[in-house]
Amino acid sequence: MKIADIELGEKPLLLAPMEDVTDPSFRYMCKRFGADVVYTEFISSDGLIRDAAKSLKKLEIDDAERPVGIQLYGHLVEPMVEAARMAEAAGPDIIDINFGCPVKKIAGRGAGSGMMRDVPLMVEMTRRIVEAVGKPVTVKTRLGWDDESKNIEEIALRLQDVGIAALTIHGRTRAQMYRGEADWTLIGQVKNNPRIHIPIIGNGDVDSGPKAAEMFDRYGVDGVMIGRATYGRPWIFREVKHYLATGEVLPQPSVCERVEIAKEHLRKSLEIKGEYVGILEMRRHLSNYFKGLPDFKPTRLKLVTLLDIPELFATLDSIAERWGDFDVSGTVPEPLSHDL
């Protein structure tokens, strides 16, 4: 599979852009475990233009992440075009447009999946961004606004016609949010439309090698994007790649292995963000590495409250000492929430 001139190989796996999750240190970890493409957290076009510090911070990328995409969202054409130019200046490999976020404060303003109710505006915004930047432009969206308006087949063709380099489709409508099961049937129909010539990437509920294999084999997608299943589990990319290559399901990493992974992740966060912010922004990740351990609540509380770096590393070491022999086979982390 290729996105424009970016060669990704056969059956690539992509890390979904997720707010408050896919920060630089987490992207680094997912890349280390085999993600072929990673994406930033979504970035507000309005925030970039008004020089909002949080939005500008999200533009920071590292060469070790490549290929990496910067994802933007907004509801007005001109600010989105300007934001795309600013994002391109940060040096990503891909500019991605978010037409899929279902959260009310985003979609209710007409951005994210709210754009699916105004297809002409969606198409015009995309066309203008494609014309404004030199990097490949991709789109992530959903099946439609609700069950009565599943218009992804029309949208895919129209976005292809204005020059996008690839399309990622999440197998739910906006009305579903993240409820129920993702429906890949329409994703497969888009992919198998003879008029479609751009890569189609499927997204939704892929949390194992067998599920990824089914999506490739049954629906013919060019790539699979993994989102919530990466929470506390960046090694899922290694698991899936191993299964696709061998048909073998890898055992879950032991508690001791998870401790070493968490320590590496923490060190990377400290390196990138400094001590204070690096610790604060790791809290959402650290405890999730150890979901399912018995009597873990007091230790979890330490992981999400400590500010002393040596004490934090010592707490991680204590997890290996206390739970090192615990059977982790049934402790695959559950998604943190359904509102990303």
Question: What are these regions, as identified by a protein language model?
Answer:
Residues 1-340:
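Flavin-dependent oxidoreductase catalytic cores
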